[in-house]
């Protein structure tokens, strides 16, 4: 069937507010522009947004060629409880907000006249999530059309039979028997062709690709399968690669062991909200790749098609996850209400979305589902694993289990339950969402981590009852997902010699320990740090903040604050640390705890440091600075202005601390090997006296209708970043529109859809969409002065 984008010409209006219709282009997130309030029933979990119901409308006259054809609408993601209406007739309801679904509109279409398509997204049923969800049609919409003879949607499946010989299987489903032709293309070149006149509606073509270029994380080679059936032509991109998993070899791609250096990500795209713009999804993948990660976990819901396309192109592995809750509510209105009736359809749709993507290397059925401590939950774990194996026998299945939490849950501490979720929600509603309430579930667990630290959590996971409450579920999956269970690894490898262990959620500070264990032990498949890029919601989880950036009102907290990459896409010093700890960069690298601060931020279990990669603290001369040197070399030495301030044996954690007085001169770290020879050096430079606002686009040119990410940064006259410079910036755009604006501060008054922002450590980010003209102009004014800074970007 032919696919056509159906994203232009929509309007949206609130069903719970008083706003009129607005013209929008999909994808669109209605929540991101809503007001934030202490009255939010979702509270900090969703960034203090209110939530609401919205109606999207598209009026169109169907093309004459659609008449007599099969016509399907595809919604890649609508949050949530989506209703689809055509010309006043309700055609579909889909409760889950993260799965793509299809609606047959053929019989409802009226030809030769205007048709009215309505989609209702209901998100006023708060609370329904533990993180920011967005509202509305936040992923693209497509229309699929096909004649009498056609290849149905998802009718082509491709997998690798033998990577050594380049043999692939192309399974083709057609509407009726007939001739099917398959061409394999490498770029524009046809490298293999096969055709067959079939008497069946499902045909398997086994094809040898000559001199096959394999797909892996370092060489993401892609081919295209062009399948023809009558007048219908379908093209599917794929990679030639096989997966295998066992305790002898670990997880292998094309016969070579791969250790997952992973990061957990939520689905939002920062200032854009939940919108799954292809440019934003690709940027997210690229940023993780640049910072040493080779895998992502789509926490805790199925990811978008756009991010999978980016993973395929860039060589990033993906573990696609199904749901955050199964049978016990974590919030009053979460997906538990519908899961028992929809889980098979949801998993089927997730697999069909993922199957041809070489980047998808595993499925996860859930996250921190305490049901896995009980017999009925263990049984359900097995049912889902077996069902996924039936749908796709080529990939392993996992589930992220919070080991300590399973034990606590089993003795009634912090356990999720329908009754507690109901009680908490009703109490919050009566008191406007601002009451101090007794935490349950993950909120209870997160507060324990903040109060007691990560060691308490990791020690708790080693207790004997934790083993009793997890081993049943682990026996019903291929990869045992350990959330915060790294201190169990060595013991469990001996106790369960046939178990493959995956660190499905881990702390940043344990990167060095994971890597040291995994390198020598194939049963340790990999690690997914919480979290990769920062995200909206789950406020305060890892947000240590100094007083002058911290706001006292709870509702000003916007993000989790625990990303190794901040919400603007800038790497934090923690990401520099993990690059070295995971041996993806030799180092040394340097982080410096802000020199001008005398107060101490409250670090949580998900925080390692507030250090920044800068030595430009103008006005702080003589103040004591804490310098962090990231290196795995035996020894490191720190030089200030060419003078040694000390040589130290490197910490086993790959993070060695020095105390030095701040001076405005070069700060250099030198690493030495076991023989005392220099094996690496790194220098941070001070800043000059002049302060300049620079507009730095990530893209030299923009496509018409495409997105651009533009960093606003205070530097000196030579371009050296000045983290202590601060101002309120007002942004205007000509030849396009401003989609989002903000800084990396976890505390935000208002939202990301205004035209002004405070800077955070001297930086902010603007996200723009180019118009149809030949250039986009961005203008920035500082509150502290009348001077305007401008930049023009060509649009092609």
Regions found by a protein language model. Give the residues of each.
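Substrate-binding clefts and catalytic carboxylate motifs of secreted carbohydrate-active enzymes
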Residues: 4-7, 11-15, 78, 126, ...
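Accessory beta-strand-rich segments of carbohydrate-active enzymes
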Residues: 3-16, 30, 46, 50-153, ...
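Conserved structural position at the C-terminal beta-strand
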Residues: 121, 227-229, 671, 714, ...
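Beta-strand-rich binding/interaction modules
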Residues: 166-196, 203, 625-644, 666-671, ...
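Extended acidic/polar, glycine-enriched regions
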Residues: 110-112, 171-246, 663-664, 673, ...
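Active-site-adjacent substrate/metal-binding segments within catalytic domains
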Residues: 35-62, 66-75, 79-86, 92-95, ...
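Short, hydrophobic beta-strand segments
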Residues: 105-107, 205-214, 657-662, 755-772
